Design a protein with these regions (language model features):
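N-terminal secretory/targeting leader peptides
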Residues: 3-4, 8-46, 54-280
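Short beta-strand-centered segments that line the small-molecule binding cleft or hinge
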Residues: 49
Length: 280
């Protein structure tokens, strides 16, 4: 569990941690919606939902049951769709594919016939190198390359359909949080708000240079076939709705996000240039 260190340590040697809440899925079914939603919000949309659309309040209500206080404390944009040892040309290439995948995205691609496993970051390179897995998703290009994925998997696919945003949270033992002074709480919250901004800015700034130099390490940046993306989105809708039917908290978070996005769409559809503006 991503925030387990705060609720399992009876001696209170660990009272806080920094984590991706999607790792809590086994205990808190709604946590992936707080961490990364396939075909979901973009980073600024998530931030707006968290700060002004009820996201903070509903997340706190989920975690108070486990005596944890979560604070939004980091944000990056899309991950890559993954690193593959072979090209992905069609839906058939996904069937039987052995891939490391986390969160709701793993459930979705498994529906298309992939064999999904969840490995810690430190074990992925060796699994790819030895052929135990054929592909992996993990993070951003700069992170993935530092872990050596570009040495053993030469096809890096986009877009990051499974994780168009990645939020990170500071999780604090609830009793510890309550014991802090108002000023200390304000300092922590202010620091995390600054971290969200700087984290996103830095992540956006450094990925392009990594991709631009892919040819020097024999890596090809590729786009997933459009028909595969459409099928992934279709299955994503099914998986998310099924999870909402199974779990009331999941349904509540999903409803909150949908309500926010429905109102936000009035602004988004009018205020921003279309992504394909230059092609119109």
């Amino acid at each position: 569990m991503g925030s387990e260190m705060c609720i399992r340590d009876r001696d209170r040697k660990v009272v806080a941690g920094y984590t991706w809440l999607g790792y809590d899925q086994g205990k808190i079914a709604a946590s992936p919606l707080i961490a990364a939603v396939p075909f979901g919000m973009e980073p600024w949309e998530y931030s707006a939902w968290w700060y002004n659309g009820g996201g903070r309040e509903i997340t706190e209500s989920l975690y108070v049951k486990y005596e944890i206080h979560p604070i939004f404390c980091g944000m990056t944009g899309p991950e890559t769709a993954g690193w593959f040892r072979e090209r992905i040309n069609s839906l058939d290439d996904v069937k039987g594919l052995k891939i490391r995948f986390a969160g709701l995205g793993g459930q979705i691609i498994e529906r298309l016939g992939a064999s999904v496993t969840m490995l810690p970051g430190g074990e992925i390179f060796q699994a790819l190198e030895k052929g135990a897995i054929d592909a992996t998703e993990f993070a951003l290009p700069i992170v993935d390359q530092a872990l050596g994925f570009s040495d053993v998997a030469k096809y890096n696919y986009y877009p990051g359909w499974h994780q168009p945003f990645t939020s990170s949270h500071l999780v604090i033992n609830l009793d510890t949080w309550k014991s802090l002074t108002r000023s200390d709480k304000a300092i922590i919250e202010m620091g995390c708000t600054a971290a969200v901004t700087r984290n996103l800015a830095h992540a956006e700034a450094v990925q392009g240079e990594i991709i631009a130099n892919f040819d020097q390490v024999g890596v090809s940046a590729e786009r997933l076939p459009l028909n595969l993306l459409k099928e992934l989105k279709k299955v994503a809708t099914q998986v998310i709705e099924e999870e909402a039917q199974r779990d009331a908290d999941f349904a509540a978070v999903l409803a909150s996000q949908k309500k926010f996005l429905a109102n936000y769409e009035y602004w988004k559809s009018l205020a921003y240039l279309p992504r394909n503006f230059d092609e119109l």
